[in-house]
Amino acid sequence: MDILTLGWVSVLTLFTYSIAMVVWGRHGM
């Protein structure tokens, strides 16, 4: 795995996590 792939994985993980936090927050969990 090169640095570019690692960068994309970290960005997508952070993005998905932030989306999940927003969705869960709106549902009052």
From Swiss-Prot:
Among the GO molecular function terms of this UniProt record, one is: electron transporter, transferring electrons within cytochrome b6/f complex of photosystem II activity
Q: How does it sit in the membrane?
A: Single-pass membrane protein
Query: Transmembrane segments in this chain: where?
Result: 3-23
What is any one of the record's Gene Ontology cellular component terms? Answer: cytochrome b6f complex
Taxonomy, superkingdom: Bacteria
Thylakoid found in the keyword field: yes
The places in or outside the cell where this protein is found are: Cellular thylakoid membrane
Ordered alphabetically, the record's keywords are: Electron transport, Membrane, Photosynthesis, Thylakoid, Transmembrane, Transmembrane helix, Transport
Q: Does the keyword Ion transport apply?
A: no
Q: Name one Pfam family in it.
A: PetN
Where's it mainly located?
membrane
GO process annotations (BP): cytochrome complex assembly; photosynthesis
Its assembly, as annotated, is: The 4 large subunits of the cytochrome b6-f complex are cytochrome b6, subunit IV (17 kDa polypeptide, PetD), cytochrome f and the Rieske protein, while the 4 small subunits are PetG, PetL, PetM and PetN. The complex functions as a dimer.
What HAMAP family does the record point to?
A: Cytb6_f_PetN
- Give the UniProt family note: Belongs to the PetN family.
Q: Give the protein's biological function.
A: Component of the cytochrome b6-f complex, which mediates electron transfer between photosystem II (PSII) and photosystem I (PSI), cyclic electron flow around PSI, and state transitions.
Name assigned to this protein: Cytochrome b6-f complex subunit 8
